């Protein structure tokens, strides 16, 4: 399905896509280094200072994507986000949503792999921003520790973003939802906001190419607390997958001109 979608849309010269992508990637990683240096004083400030600086970095990335790669973004359903603490279960197709969703929620934090917290500087800032680490190698203990930390952040009024499939999935790939989100939902007692998107069409998994087009993100109806785990997980998967399939089918990236074409 993913490759079929690549066949649709306005054609853009292959060499132009490659050139834009290389330029963007160079600037993207350069800005990471710049912001890591700029962020050093935030170690002496409250946690929200690094979160706000991360939002500035996210806006910079969106500007670079729009200016260089001709990738725009549209958010729908923002009025559906309830006030106060909640969990956010987002479709994960690309690295894009790991920074872009920072701009959707007022006090966001992410559930992340514990190994990321060990990366020099980058990981330290994740600790400072009070991200919620999870150890994939120790499942039961990991769920307990994750829940404890999640509750701490929810008491601070934060929105906890989790990717329920645990890893990036190519557009059109069969869903693979994990039980961790159901555990978090049952143990925290806060609403869960599903998020659908089509970012993988433009910023592909394990691809350096950035295809022009419009990434669409849709905030879906919140799932209230109180459902049993199985019912919740079935509803979550249905809501996210249905909306994501619609967004993917409605918008495909421009295709590069085949090599050798005139």
Question: What feature does the model see in each segment?
Answer:
Residues 75, 88, 110-111, 217-219:
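Generic preference for hydrophobic
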Residues 75, 132-135, 225:
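Short acidic-hydrophobic, aromatic-tinged amphipathic segments that line or gate anion-handling sites
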Residues 77-81, 149-152:
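Short amphipathic alpha-helix with an adjacent loop that forms part of the alpha/beta core around
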Residues 1-11, 15-18, 143-262:
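Non-catalytic C-terminal accessory region of glycerolipid acyltransferases
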Residues 35-60, 66-68, 80-139:
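Catalytic core of membrane glycerolipid acyltransferases/transacylases, capturing the structured
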Residues 73-75, 203-204:
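Aromatic-capped interface at the extracytoplasmic side
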Residues 1-74:
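N-terminal membrane-anchoring alpha-helices
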């Amino acid at each position: 399905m993913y490759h079929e979608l690549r066949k649709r849309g306005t054609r853009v010269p292959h060499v132009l896509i490659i050139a834009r992508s290389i330029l963007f990637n160079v600037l993207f990683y350069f800005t990471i280094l710049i912001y890591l240096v700029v962020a050093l004083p935030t170690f002496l400030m409250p946690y929200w200072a690094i979160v706000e600086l991360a939002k500035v970095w996210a806006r910079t990335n969106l500007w670079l994507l729009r200016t260089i790669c001709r990738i725009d973004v549209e958010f729908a359903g923002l009025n559906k986000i309830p006030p106060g603490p909640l969990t956010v279960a987002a479709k994960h197709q690309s690295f894009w949503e790991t920074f872009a969703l920072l701009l959707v929620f007022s006090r966001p934090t992410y559930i992340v792999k514990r190994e990321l917290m060990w990366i020099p500087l980058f990981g330290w800032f994740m600790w400072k921003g009070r991200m919620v680490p999870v150890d994939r190698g120790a499942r039961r203990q990991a769920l307990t520790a994750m829940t404890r930390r999640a509750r701490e952040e929810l008491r601070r009024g934060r929105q906890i973003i989790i990717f329920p499939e645990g890893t990036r999935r190519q557009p059109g790939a069969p869903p693979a939802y994990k039980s961790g989100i159901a555990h978090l939902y049952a143990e925290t007692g806060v609403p869960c906001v599903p998020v659908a998107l089509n970012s993988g069409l433009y910023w592909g998994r394990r691809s350096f190419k950035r295809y022009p087009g419009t990434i669409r993100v849709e905030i879906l109806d919140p799932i209230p607390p109180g459902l049993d785990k199985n019912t919740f997980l079935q509803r979550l998967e249905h809501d996210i997958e249905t909306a994501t399939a619609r967004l993917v089918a409605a918008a495909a990236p421009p295709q590069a001109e085949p090599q050798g074409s005139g």
